[in-house]
Amino acid sequence: VTRFRPCIDLHGGRVKQIVGGTLTQDGVSLRTNFVSDRGAAWYADLYRRDGLSGGHVIKLGPGNDHVAREALAAWPGGLQVGGGMTPENAEEWISSGASHVIVTSCLFDAEGTLRMDRLKDLVSAVGAERLVLDLSCRRVQGGWAVAMNRWQTLTELRVTAETLDVLAEYCAEFLIHAADVEGLCTGIDRELVEMLGNWRRLPMTYAGGISRIQDIDEIDALSGGTMDATVGSALDLFGGGLIRYGDLVARQRGKSGTETV
């Protein structure tokens, strides 16, 4: 069954929810949906108490290492961490309490070409069983292309079943943000979910556009329950008015809790 995987998105040392396609190097075009008064460790402890394992801490740019470590310390082994991961620092983040490290940009050169040697270096550093490959993507003609550098740069790698087959040998899970709909609360990229949901070889988590619990049910149906889901800006926990966090916890526990606000 499709599980709810919680998230802690960090930007400038604060827990935030941002519109996915607006995060640039200079920050001028940044659109923020929510900035929390609570620290990352508060969220990590909440997820721990509610038994929501497998969530992710994402560091969006510099100035987030300290708060990310605080979150991991609040739930050792309960959260994955991503953002700026390299073969050189990955083991350090595992030692800090991350269950897995999440990688994207370091797998590509400046031109957006996949560097299999870097992927193999990461496997050597922490093991495939500790690696989550973030294939967050944007729509291009004929499909989806993996996006790197805060989702601003399209790589040459297309998100296809063939790509997943090749990369599956080097990781434990995939994380897929549909960057075009991330943070907009306008519904999921159904075609992307359908394509990914037919693959089913490794655990996979989808994020992007979820605005009601029925979206999670749809992901469940399209993937045969093999794909998990992350909810961000729609969630009351992050200032949203569309989905109650308590309903997602209840759903996970097999109770009825499917009303939306």
PLM region spans:
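Glycine-rich, proline-tolerant flexible connector loops at the mouths of alpha/beta enzymes
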Residues: 51-67, 105-113, 176-185
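Catalytic cores of alpha/beta
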Residues: 66-101, 191-229, 245
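C-terminal helical cap(s) of enzyme catalytic domains, especially alpha/beta-barrels
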Residues: 113-125, 216-261
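N-terminal beta-alpha supersecondary unit
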Residues: 20-64
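Conserved anion-binding
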Residues: 11, 15-26, 94-181
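Short beta-strand/loop segments at the ligand-binding rim of alpha/beta enzyme cores
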Residues: 3, 72-81, 128-132, 143-152, ...
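Conserved, mostly hydrophobic/aromatic
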Residues: 9, 47, 55, 81, ...
